[in-house]
């Protein structure tokens, strides 16, 4: 008797369902993707009990012909590809022909569909077995309902999470699809309650507002970049808006949401030193490319893909984000609201909200969050009108300018303390050089600020006609020192420094294996490792550009890079070394500065290429606008 047999289709579908249908969110994803492939312009998703009791997807797409309805639930039956050639230029979200039979094999399914001709077709399946098929009256489109999910696979049902968790996963899937397809109107209901609604007018920013709230949408910066092979667009939130996890970064390739570690790192690299350690950005990155450059046939879920010329694409994503932020003024307001989205405003959100606001809206608000939101930096034109009305009651800013101007001659006669002068002077020279060589950087990203004092020997207080500024002096000079050392360390030569006392480095077994494997690569960058006992190496010489006193830290950074990327990136290494040097060299807290020292530091900061955060991503400047100050003292209501 033969031991090897061919599994029947029913069992094969249940096995395939283990990969395709992991949880209720997987069902929603597959059904909505089918609706999108059918050219739908309106998709409604209804779920009950987190999708465990019922999932219903209704669309106004092309529908399915009567003779194809039964075939659609056969394994590997599809209308989206026909030949081998089609597999290498896939333009649809689905193509494997596994979703419908896999879903049907572990649930009860009812489908009603019509192509808009003579009525429609209705079919009912239980565990993949057809129980009923016939005609029904309906308009063009498809209405598919899934109930009793995993009823015949108790092992899978046992690992399903709580209703709230499953609803969160479903919401995440629909959010990503809505972001990827702004021209499609999405509605998501849970237990009859509307959770998400998008207009389908093609405006991705409105979709962002519906998902993340208007406050976040107002902080979005548009992205735009392209090469011969790739086009990048989308939005990234300003660095003051961050999250504790990576899940708020959405990568959308040809309308498909994907996960890609290299591209996610490219997004983070675009923010570079603008993000605090342990925080992640909100970003929606749309990537358009030739379908031949991407392989989506990696996993049945189609979330993992392989991209040709991935390194070039990562570089484009990083440069696009960097370029977008170079044009922005990134000083956060001290009173900026941080609340979540306001559902009452989702449906009426328009782009006009980003450029204007009526004073009557502010007076009519009963919510402090709404009031703060409407008085945010988006509405500066309205606020400045009220500021001018009260200008006669406040000390003239000209007095401050005159007082500050009198300090300028002192700067020429009496240089600041040596510790500050070297960093400030070097940074100012570097910033000046960058301004001459790069016309793309907008002028006056940081306004002129006039120091009026210091708080606790740590924070510089400055003002101008726009309000009060609080500057972290350590973070400010750390930024200056970083830019100075980045250029200094950037002068890499092939010269080596012989050491009188060799450096010994102890490694783990894994690190030692990587070092031995890449000895030649390390020699190329001027680092010669000699074995010196078990898991220990000795270094007798190193490149002359290694910073004095930080040789061991630099070598350790090289080893860490080798472990992560299997190569040594000199450019990245220089940046890490510059950050380390700048942190050690910058002035510390409780250091009292003279007026001319504060002024010199603020002027150097204005000319910095990235004046808003220190190299670790912490903010340097916080602003309290004149209006907010007047509001605190009840001068305006």
UniProtKB/Swiss-Prot annotation:
The gene is mutL. GO terms for molecular function: ATP binding; ATP hydrolysis activity; ATP-dependent DNA damage sensor activity; mismatched DNA binding. Residues 352-384, 405-430 are annotated as: Disordered. CDD domains: HATPase_MutL-MLH-PMS-like, MutL_Trans. It comes from Halalkalibacterium halodurans (strain ATCC BAA-125 / DSM 18197 / FERM 7344 / JCM 9153 / C-125) (Bacillus halodurans). GO terms for biological process: mismatch repair. It comes from the Bacteria. InterPro entries: DNA_mismatch_repair_CS, DNA_mismatch_repair_MutL, DNA_mismatch_S5_2-like, HATPase_C_sf, MutL/Mlh/PMS, MutL/Mlh/Pms-like, MutL_C, MutL_C_dimsub. This is DNA mismatch repair protein MutL. It holds the Pfam family MutL_C. Belongs to the DNA mismatch repair MutL/HexB family. Signal peptide: none annotated. GO terms for cellular component: mismatch repair complex.
């Amino acid at each position: 008797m033969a031991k090897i047999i061919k599994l029947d289709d029913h069992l094969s579908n249940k096995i395939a369902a283990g990969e395709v249908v992991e949880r209720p969110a997987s069902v929603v994803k597959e059904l909505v993707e089918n609706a999108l492939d059918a050219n739908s312009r309106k998709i409604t998703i209804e779920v009950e009990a987190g999708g465990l009791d019922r999932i219903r997807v209704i669309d106004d797409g092309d529908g399915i012909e009567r003779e194809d309805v039964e075939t659609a639930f056969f394994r590997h039956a599809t209308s989206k590809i026909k030949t081998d050639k089609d597999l290498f230029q896939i333009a649809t979200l689905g193509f494997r022909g596994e979703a419908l039979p896999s879903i049907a094999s572990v649930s009860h399914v009812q489908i009603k569909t019509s192509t808009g001709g003579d009525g429609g077709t209705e079919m009912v399946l239980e565990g993949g077995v057809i129980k009923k098929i016939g005609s029904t009256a309906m308009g063009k489109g498809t209405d598919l309902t899934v109930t009793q999910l995993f009823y015949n696979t108790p092992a899978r049902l046992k690992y399903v999470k709580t209703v709230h968790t499953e609803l969160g996963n479903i919401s995440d899937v629909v959010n990503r699809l809505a972001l990827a397809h702004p021209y499609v109107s999405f509605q998501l209901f849970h237990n009859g309650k509307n959770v998400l609604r998008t207009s389908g007018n093609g405006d991705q920013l409105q979709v962002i507002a519906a998902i993340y709230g208007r406050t976040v949408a107002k902080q979005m910066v548009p992205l735009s970049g392209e090469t011969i092979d790739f086009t990048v667009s989308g939005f990234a939130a300003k660095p003051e808006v961050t999250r504790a996890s990576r899940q708020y970064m959405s990568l959308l390739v040809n309308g498909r949401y994907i996960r890609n570690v290299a591209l996610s790192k490219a997004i983070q690299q675009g923010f570079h030193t603008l993000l605090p350690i342990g925080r992640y950005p909100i970003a929606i990155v749309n990537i358009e490319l030739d379908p031949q450059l991407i392989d989506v046939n990696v996993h049945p879920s189609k979330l993992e893909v392989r991209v040709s010329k991935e390194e070039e694409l990562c570089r484009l994503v990083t440069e696009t984000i960097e370029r977008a932020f170079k044009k922005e003024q990134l000083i956060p307001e001290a009173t900026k609201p941080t609340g979540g989205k306001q559902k009452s405003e989702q449906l009426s959100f328009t782009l006009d909200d980003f450029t204007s606001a009526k004073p009557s809206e502010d007076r009519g608000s009963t919510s402090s969050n709404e009031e703060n939101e409407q008085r945010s930096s988006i509405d500066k034109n309205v606020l400045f009108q009220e500021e001018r009305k009260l200008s006669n009651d406040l000390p003239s800013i000209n007095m401050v300018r005159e007082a500050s101007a009198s300090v300028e001659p002192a700067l020429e006669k009496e240089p600041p303390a040596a510790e500050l002068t070297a960093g400030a002077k070097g940074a100012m020279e570097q910033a000046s050089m960058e301004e001459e060589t790069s016309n793309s950087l907008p002028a006056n990203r940081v306004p002129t600020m006039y120091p009026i004092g210091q708080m606790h020997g740590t924070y510089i207080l400055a003002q101008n006609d726009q309000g009060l500024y609080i500057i972290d002096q350590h973070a400010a000079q750390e930024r200056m020192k970083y830019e100075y050392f980045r250029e200094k360390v950037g002068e890499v030569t092939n010269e080596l420094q012989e050491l009188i006392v060799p450096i010994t480095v102890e490694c783990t077994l894994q690190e030692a294996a990587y070092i031995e494997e890449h000895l030649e690569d390390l020699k190329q960058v001027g680092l010669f490792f000699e074995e010196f006992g078990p898991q220990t190496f000795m270094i007798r010489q190193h490149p002359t550009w290694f910073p004095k006193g930080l040789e061991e830290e630099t070598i350790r950074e090289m080893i860490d890079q080798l472990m992560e990327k299997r190569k040594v990136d000199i450019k990245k290494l220089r940046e890490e070394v510059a950050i380390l040097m700048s942190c050690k060299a910058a002035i510390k807290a409780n250091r009292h500065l003279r007026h001319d020292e504060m002024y010199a530091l603020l002027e150097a900061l204005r000319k910095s290429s990235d004046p808003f955060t220190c190299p670790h991503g912490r903010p340097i400047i916080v602003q309290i606008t004149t209006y907010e100050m007047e509001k605190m003292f009840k001068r305006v209501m």
